[in-house]
Regions:
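Short, well-structured N-terminal submotif of metal-dependent ribonuclease cores
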Residues: 1-49, 67-73, 151-166
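Acidic, metal-associated active-site segment
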Residues: 17, 109-126
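Short active-site oxyanion
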Residues: 43-47, 85-87, 121-126
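Acidic catalytic patch
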Residues: 51, 80-104
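Short secondary-structure boundary segments
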Residues: 51-52, 131-132
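Helix-adjacent hinge/juxtasegments
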Residues: 60-91
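Short loop/helix-cap segments at secondary-structure boundaries that form the rim of catalytic
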Residues: 134-140
Length: 166
């Protein structure tokens, strides 16, 4: 049996965009996000980062958080330039169909459905995420890889950013 493109022999989890976004701009969770992503990139944490999560992080960081585009581009490009085996490059029609099925069945976003489909495809049930909505999927385990106090600070920081005048 061959392994899927972008996979390794053992995958512990799949990384959600919500873990990548804090690495893109100054915030209380930035260092923890960089440390965790670094561990994934060198496979100390055997997980996959969908390349689509990098694109999604750019969208979220620049559009919703209004982080500087050039700085976000540089951070995300530097992650990709590592050419780490942690990156999962493909969204196959099979995974897209499964993603849509999970999204419809569990009333989650299609992107979250893709994370579920990818995790199960890779033989794991763990998704590293700040998104508790993923817990709706009973056979998936959501792991938040950061300390609770830092997450609280991050959410307060983001809330203040979003409510501040431009």
């Amino acid at each position: 049996m061959s392994t899927p493109r972008g996979s390794s022999a053992y995958v512990r989890g799949v990384v959600d965009v919500s873990i990548v976004v804090p690495a893109c701009f100054e915030n209380p969770l930035k260092e923890e996000a960089i440390d965790f992503l670094s561990a994934v990139l060198v496979q100390e944490v055997p997980a996959k980062i969908p390349v689509t999560a990098i694109l999604g992080a750019y969208h979220i960081a620049t559009r919703y958080i209004r982080a500087p585009r050039e700085a976000v581009k540089n951070v995300l490009s530097s992650l990709l330039r590592t050419r780490s085996p942690a990156f999962f490059p493909d969204v196959s029609p099979y995974l897209a169909i499964e993603a849509l099925r999970y999204a419809a069945d569990f009333h989650i976003e299609s992107w979250d459905g893709y994370l579920v489909a990818l995790a199960l495809f890779l033989g794991t049930n763990t998704i590293y995420s700040l998104d508790k909505e993923l817990s709706r999927v009973s056979h998936v385990r959501v792991v938040i890889p950061f300390p609770e106090d830092k997450i609280r600070e991050y959410h307060e920081y983001i809330s203040a950013l979003r409510h501040s005048p431009t």
